[in-house]
Every structure is written in C-alpha cells, then in structure tokens.
C-alpha cells in the first residue's frame, strides 16, 4: 500500500511539474521600444501575456485585465519576470515599464520637501504609465484599461502609489514592493497589497504606511518579510521570489487559472512571511 502511495505521489509530482513548465512556456514576452513624441522620451516596455488568452482576446471572446509594473531605481524593467509571470498566468496583459533613463538626473533625497524632492520623478513616471496605456490600446484593444493594476518596486512602487492617488477612477489594485516615500491611498474601492522588507538600509518615511487600524478598516494587506530591499526583483533568491509569487497569486485570486501554490498559512496576507531559510 505504501509503495502504491509513493508511486502515485511521484506521478502527481511529474504531472504538476509538466503543468508548471507548460504554463510558463505559454507566456509570451515581447520588448516594445516606444517613443513619446510629446515629451521626446523613449519608453521601453517588456510585455507579457498568456498565449491562449491573447488568442481569445484577438477573437473577441475575452477581455484582458491590465497590469503595469514600474521598476526600482537602478533595477531594469526586465528584472521582474517573476511578477510578470504570476500576473500573466492569471490572465493579465502585463507591461513592465523602464521608468528611468541613463540621461535622467540622479535620484536624490531632499529632506523637508514634499516626497523628499522627488515629485518630478513621480510625475514623469505617471506620464510614462499613461503613455504606455495609450500605446497598449492600439496593440490590444480587447483589454480593460478602465481598471488598472499598478505594481512597483521601491521608487517604482512610489510611482505606482502616486499614479493611483492622481487617477483613482482608473486604478483598481496597487501592489508595491517596499515603496518608501509616497503615502498609501485610502480608498475602499482600491485593493492594496504591499510587501515590506527587513532591510536596515531602506527605511520607510513616517506617514507612508497606514496604521494597523486603517489597514484593517480599508482592507489594505501589509506583508512584512525577512527579505532585503533588492531581493524583491529577479535579483533575489529563489525562496524569496517564490514566497512573493505565492502571496501575490493569492491576492489576485478571483480566478483559479494560475498554477502557483498558495502560501501555507491561514491568513497569509496579514501574517509575516518567513522565516526562511534565506541566504
């Protein structure tokens, strides 16, 4: 009997592995080198979409939800494939935007100024997002551009939160990975998930995070992790990326199309992730 159970378990593992591999191969990635003539600015985008859902959208039988990822400072927009794949597996049309260019002024911190002197950076990021949305409408008209999901890491998370604050009617979800400067949007019409690092070199500004009472009342999910700030990209160890993927998948979980495993806690979005081991 035990031998039979072992064989069955092995078969299930093989089938599961094939399904996971198949779903990842089924996600199409494409680089878009766009140019905003109004601002004379190039905007590079890494596009990700499930091939089967893309085909259904082209046939007019499916409308794709849209997610836009904003990169962290010094991290490339192509270094968030672990997030792109979760979102695409859930059926999203995903655009990972290169928010900064080598020609941009360096990111500085000016204590005492609004958003520590980075308002122009956030406005530029907001303009990039709106420009990409307009370009995506030409490429994939059968997508929902009225209820966007904005995702961002570090400075990109601040751009996502700032854009959501400026355009609450366009944004339905915000997912940030250790944004430090822009206070959270308070709206019962917007779902928010935020992963927080345990990195002494990256401290969140006062007033950015909601109080526990506000988070509970407004349904904001704060996930405290043992991870370093830079681990919240493809640069992070596999264990960290897997934990973030699983929690993100559960947050998105209106459908059951994703092959990602749920996190193994009773209330994963409120509980801490961890403890590891993590390198």
Language-model regions, residue ranges each:
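An N-terminal hydrophobic leader/cap segment in hydrolases
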Residues: 4-56, 260-264, 268-279
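C-terminal catalytic histidine-bearing segment of alpha/beta-hydrolase fold enzymes
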Residues: 217-279
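Primarily recognizes the serine-hydrolase "nucleophile elbow" in alpha/beta-hydrolase
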Residues: 134-188
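Short beta-strand/loop motif that positions the catalytic acidic residue
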Residues: 193-196
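Loop/turn elements at helix/coil->beta-strand transitions in domains of secreted/extracellular proteins
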Residues: 63-66, 90-93, 145-147, 169-173, ...
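Conserved alpha/beta-hydrolase "acid-adjacent" motif
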Residues: 201-207
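Serine-hydrolase catalytic machinery in alpha/beta-hydrolase-like enzymes
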Residues: 36-143
